[in-house]
Amino acid sequence: MDVIISTLAVFWLILAIFFILIKRGLWIFSDVSKSLSMFMLEKALGPAIDFVSGRPGSATTAWIIHGFDWTFAASTVTFVGLWLTHDPTALHSFESWGYHPKSSELIYAGRLTALFGAIGMMVIGASLHALPKLSGTNLASESNATLVSLLWTLSVLLMFIGSQNSVILGITILPVANLLLSLASIAIVINMVITVSEATKDIPFPGWLILFAVIGNIAAILAVFVSGAYEEGTGQWLHFHLSGGTFFFCGLAGGIMGGLIGYID
């Protein structure tokens, strides 16, 4: 219980520091650091950035399309998991291929793909549309946000694989998936923070919810390691609930309210 309380305290402290830094005018984002961050978002990626479209709205479209794809995958996997609950031998023919599907594993995989794949990608897609509208500016890098959607999809795919086989070739899959998800989250956070730094008006409440949603995953990882929850064995559970809850509720509320405000304006 102590490690859970300390993790929550560190998590909310990180979010409070993030809020204060942005509210004070983003002094950490001088012209030099902005230029360096934009270089990291685009030019540092090399030729890969040239394969994605940078037109306005392309990032939102890419994320939402990926989200719909994961919606289909999550619903299918969950259905198969529930089917195996009713009839455990329904897919016994797969055992000849070396695959032994279990109901609990498939339902768990369905939850992961639904939260981080379906809901997560559609929430980020809506946020990439709403936040620039709320800030009175354009998204800092449409190209990077589009490319990062592929990295996020890869991380969700590894989550699905890791829920079935936790260790492959001596490599624990879920930490690798979390690492890729964190890298994608950092890129999205930098993109949104640069966007907010160019805001032409005060950020309304839905905009803050969107920012907290995208910083939640990074804050959860830092909180788990700082509090020692990772060594206690509860790190994965805490990370899933902290990042998932913050991301889902803040992102969904911010995206919906931001979209409504943008529509009314």
Language-model-detected regions and their locations in the chain:
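Hydrophobic alpha-helical transmembrane segments of multi-pass integral membrane proteins
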Residues: M1-D265
